[in-house]
Amino acid sequence: MRIENSKYPHNWGLSPCKGREMDSEMDKVLTVIVPVYNMEKYIRQCLGSLVIGEVLERIEVLVVLDGSKDGSAGIAYEFVERYPDTFRIIYKANGGHGSAINTGLMMASGEYVKILDSDDWVDRDAFCRLVDCLETGEADVVWSNYYWVYEMNGEKAIQYRDPFTDVVYGKKYRFEDIADRTFIKMHSMTIRTELARQAGRKIDENCYYVDVEFVMYPITEVETIIFLDEFVYMYRLGRSGQSMSMEQMRRNHRNHEQVLKSLLAFYDEQKFRHLDQAHLDYLEKGIARVVSSHFKIYLSFPCSGKVFAMMKALDEKIREEYPDVYKKVENKVVWAIRRSGYLLYYPGHFCMSLKEKKA
């Protein structure tokens, strides 16, 4: 891809970056990958939240412009000009969120890596403490919490206060000791860059809902984890066109199904590796969560025999080919539908419709 704009002194393809080349002696503790596609309304807040004097020299921010056509590039360039030792821009053809993450991972120089979506931002004080924790280099993954922040009124909400009961914050745990007690989401995860690269599988490109792939693929290599009692990530909710809205999930349901298929294929690969039981159980539990989400999408569609048949066929395939994943589904609605021979699909759809109308 070529950039024809006199404001930019070079033309960039996939690999070249604007920003000072990172000196091998300038060790970066953390690389923050910011995938960007047409986010000029939000990107200044996102990047600005990372401009923190205490950590600027210790972090690298890779702004991956994924074929963005609005003014996002110009805003990002302002940060490169002011902080060339921290901010870098990577231009690439549009390939979706996963493609931007894959590209960022290739270019990352930090010991750890974190994904920050360009419509989200970080809490400055909490982010500083995260970087301080990472600098010790003690664990493969550092977990930190996040707020949901509603676009309409700025109110914050939490999904859960603690990752599990009786967690000891700051303690280094063996992953196998806590694998059955928690589930890590992308917004909470900061992981060693080398482990993220060693996953052996690229994140799906031209596809939504790949956050779970970023977590699940490298988790099989994770041995240690520290839980940090900080709300670092500010996750914006209610933005128009947001992929996690139910309307968008219906529209992109095939993307969601593709992610599920990719995770099942990865699970097959890991079984042949004779993965230890704790990691295998974690994979099964994580994929089961995606199965539950897919049921939710089916239930949100207008009621039809076609949707009923699709839901039933997929679930029966999982029961026959992935029985351990099937059994790890915890959602009570899914199990009620299963036990009814899928006949509760119809009242389930009705309840889902009412819930969506109230939202």
Annotate the PLM regions.
Residues 2, 12, 299-359:
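Membrane-interface aromatic/basic loop that binds lipid-linked glycans or pyrophosphate carriers
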Residues 232-239, 245-274, 293, 297-322:
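Catalytic core of nucleotide-sugar-dependent glycosyltransferases
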Residues 92-108:
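Glycine-rich, basic loop-to-helix element that forms the pyrophosphate-binding segment
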Residues 113:
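Short aromatic/hydrophobic "clamp" motif used to bind/position activated sugar donors
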Residues 58-68, 88-93, 118:
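Short beta-strand/loop segment that forms part of the nucleotide-sugar
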